[in-house]
Amino acid sequence: MDEVRLSDTHLNRQGDRMHSIYSLDKTNQAALLEGVALLSRFYWGLAAEGNRDILQGIYLRPFEALKPIVGYEPPDILDELRAINTSFLDEDEIFQYLEQAYVRLFINSRDGITAPLYASCYVAESAPGENAPLMGPPAALMKERFQSKGLSLGDHIHEPPDHLSIELEYLYFLLERGWSDGDAALKDEAVSFAGQIMLPWVVRFQERFVAIETECRFYQLTTAILCAILRFIGASDKP
């Protein structure tokens, strides 16, 4: 995979103090966990009901809390997402808008799947935009990671283990358990998993649709936030 550059430092605008997952306070830990959980939800695809937090922009709160620490590109990314939210009148309207974009980008379109949600599809591409087969080495490695932690996918999940949302749920597990148990090994794995495993393929995933999708920018923007969060975690230095 192509080398993905991690930013050298993440500085607190109020004090120029380096931030990393090792130094986050409880409030920012909670915001990061909530942000990762929300991103996982988005890439599963939204349900027909229960989207009032998106309609009202409430879901942006953890991302707003993380902005001084993570840094987003473009900097006004949250304002653009907020503008999308306010352009709809009810939950059904915003659901239809996002569902159509989700299917068009990640499931099927006239010209095929624009950006598959599986890490295996971005390994050993023979040509730009060409997908590698499903259930490749990334899927096998994710299965091994789950087994090594005594985890398993629920019976209701019928996706390969390298689906983006599943990888985000695994990252959530590493962070939450690493912080709550004070487990240095899990925190270290969260850093390497975000920066070395997830970020390279998620950047390729983002590149697939960033210049193509013009009708709905929601997933362009949330994927930009995801990349920023992965860079932040992956660049964390041990104290």
Indicate residue ranges for each PLM-predicted region.
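Surface/interface-facing alpha-helical segments and adjacent flexible terminal/loop regions used
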Residues: 2-239
